[in-house]
Amino acid sequence: LGYELNPLDGKSNPISPPFSIWIDSDVAHGRATLGWQYEGPPATVHGGFVCAIFDQFLGIAQLITGQPGVTGTLTTRFHRPTPLNVELKLIGRVKDVKGRKNILTGEIWANDVMTASCEGLFIHISKERFLQMRKADG
């Protein structure tokens, strides 16, 4: 899943961290390990990268709805510092679907401690619109 050069899970992008995502029935799961290049406060992941991981993860998790879309809002709560160089576990669920709006929740866990959580609103776009966007990208 994803694009080859995506900065978060693109296999050909040198800044992409080890990141895997899979869907099991109605729950999305992920694993990521962020190294020193993602450091914010000492020995912890920069909050911007935490948000980016959530955006990518929930963007794929919304495939559960059958109507994937683009990010409308992403509200992140930081519970504890997210450590570097530790396997992070991600869990994502669909909270609600209202017409074209997909609302999902996500959590990041490190060593059995939840470090961050979020809620994302994604707006479904048609396959035709998606292809138009892709074509404009070149």
Which role does the model predict for each range below?
Residues 1-31:
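Non-catalytic linker/capping segments at the edges of enzyme domains
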Residues 18-20, 91-94, 119:
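Short, surface-exposed charged micro-motifs
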Residues 22-27, 45-68:
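Active-site helix/loop of acyl-thioester processing domains in fatty-acid/polyketide metabolism
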Residues 34-48:
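Short histidine-centered catalytic/ligand-binding loop motif
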Residues 56-89:
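Hydrophobic beta-strand-centered segment that forms part of the acyl-chain substrate-binding groove
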Residues 82-84, 95-138:
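HotDog/MaoC-like acyl-thioester-processing domains
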